[in-house]
Amino acid sequence: MTVQQLIQRLDQKVQQLYQAHLSKREEKIFAKFDRTLFSENGQNVSFYLKEINQTLDRIKTLESNDSNHYNFLAERLLAQCSVLSEALVRKNTHLTESQTTTKQTIQKSQHSIHKLPPRERLEKYYEAREQLNNLYRQHKDLAQAEKNNDEKIRYAQLAEVYKKRQQKCQDAIDLLEEYLVFKEEVENRENTENK
């Protein structure tokens, strides 16, 4: 298959996706997407269709003799299309659930970490900090490697968001560590006084 044929097939796929979900453009999607596919979660359908179109445009404007570049972007585009379609199908089949129940479940899972004992919570914070560090480095590297200015800016902005979140996580770790040291000192003092 030539590059031109590949682009035509991908263009058809994107057009089919647009036609299938044209009426749902303003619907919000609450699925969590892989950050390598979409830049944000919780956006409306038109946002994701726009990002799919940006990937298609990148393929159309790509000037490379290496077929791996085209394959990589084509696979990304197809993955974007399929996860968006799956999310829309899932959303439409689960419309019978009440939204308040869903919101309560999300809120409970977000706050469940705060109900853990301090030492277990600290472990979760360490894991989160490590993940945020990795995401920061990954997006910083992507920003440096990216040729397209818009994409470079987007990756740099995402890297900054991860850096700020990492700093908040570090602040929470510091505070929790201080608390645990303080608690240990108080317990040691009480133990020596009781002897």
UniProtKB/Swiss-Prot annotation:
Q: Which domain of life is it from?
A: Bacteria
Q: Which Gene3D superfamilies match?
A: 1.20.1270.340
| Keywords recorded for this protein, A-Z | DNA replication, DNA-binding, Primosome
Question: Is DNA-binding one of the keywords?
Answer: yes
Transmembrane stretches in the record are none
Name any one Pfam family assigned in the record. PriC
Q: How does it assemble?
A: Monomer. Component of the replication restart primosome, which is composed of PriA, PriB, PriC, DnaB and DnaT; DnaG primase associates transiently with this complex. Interacts with the C-terminus of SSB; this interaction is required to load the main replicative helicase onto substrate replication forks. Interacts with helicase DnaB alone and in the DnaB-DnaC complex, probably 1:1 binding with DnaB.
Tell me the function of this protein: Involved in the restart of stalled replication forks, which reloads the DnaB replicative helicase on sites other than the origin of replication. Recognizes abandoned replication forks and remodels DNA single-stranded binding protein (SSB) on ssDNA to uncover a loading site for DnaB. There are several restart pathways, the PriA-PriC pathway is a minor restart pathway. Part of the minor PriC-Rep pathway for restart of stalled replication forks, which has a different substrate specificity than PriA. Part of the major restart pathway with PriA, PriB, DnaB, DnaT and DnaG primase.
Q: Family assignment?
A: Belongs to the PriC family.
Question: What name does this protein carry?
Answer: Replication restart protein PriC
Which species?
Haemophilus influenzae (strain ATCC 51907 / DSM 11121 / KW20 / Rd)
